[in-house]
UniProtKB/Swiss-Prot annotation:
It is a lipid-anchor. This is Protein eak-4. It comes from Caenorhabditis elegans. Together with eak-6 and sdf-9, negatively regulates dauer larva formation downstream of the insulin-like receptor daf-2 and in parallel with age-1, pdk-1 and akt-1. One of its GO terms (biological process) is dauer larval development. Keywords: Cell membrane, Lipoprotein, Membrane, Myristate. It comes from the Eukaryota.
Amino acid sequence: MGQCLAVHRRIMASQEFPNIPQPESQCHDAFIRYSPGRYERRAARSQVDYYLLPQAPRLMTEDLDKKEFQRLYDARCELVECPAGRRAMQLDVQIYADRYEATLNKILETSQELDKGLEDIFQAYTKDDPLADKVMNCRLTVDEMGRVYEHFFRESAWNLDSFVEYRKNLARDAYLLLADLKIAIQRLGMHFNPNFEDAQVKVDFQIMQAEQIIFHFKRTYRDALKHNPDSITEFVEDELEDPGTPL
C-alpha cells in the first residue's frame, strides 16, 4: 500500500502527469488504475483525486491551486497510512472505547445501507424505471462510507489496545476499494446489461469487512475487559490461538 501512495505522490508532484502503467498489485489494483494514453492536467488530477479520495468531490484546477491541493492530498495520505495507536489516552479509557465502537457500528450500518441502495437500483431496473436517482443515492452512500472510515482512522490514533493497528489494516483494505465500488455502481446506470453481480460482490465485501472488524473488537477488547480489566492482552492471548488473524 505504501508503494501505491508513493506512486500517487509522484504523480501529484509531476508537472506533466506522464503515462502510468497498470499496477501489478492484485490487492490494491483498484486503488490506482489508469487507461492507456495521456490525460490533460485537469483530468489527471481529477483521476487521482477520484481513486484516492472516493468520498470527496472532484477538485478542479480552478477551485484549488496546486499547492493547496497537494497539501490536502498529503494530509489524506497521512491519515490513511499512518500507524494506529500512536497517541496515549488522556481521558477515561471508556470514553475512547465507546467512541471507537460507535464508529465501527456506523461503518456496519452504512455498509448495510449500500446493500439496500443496490437492491433499490435492481428493483428499478427490473421495472424498467429510471436508474439515475437510485444510482446517485447509492454513490452518495459510498461517499458517506468513506467519511466514516476516515473518522475511524482518526479514532484509531489512540492506543486503546494492542490490536488497533490490525483493525485499522482491515478498515484500510475496505476503504481503498471504495473507489472501485463507486465505479461499479456508476456503471449500473450506463449499460443496457448492468453487471449487478460485480457490484454485489463489492458491497458484500464491505459488509463482511465491517462485521469482521466489529467481531474482532468485541472479542479482543470488550470480552477481555469483562474478564480482566487490568490485562486485556493477556486474556486475548490465552483465548485466541492467533489474535492477529481474522476471526
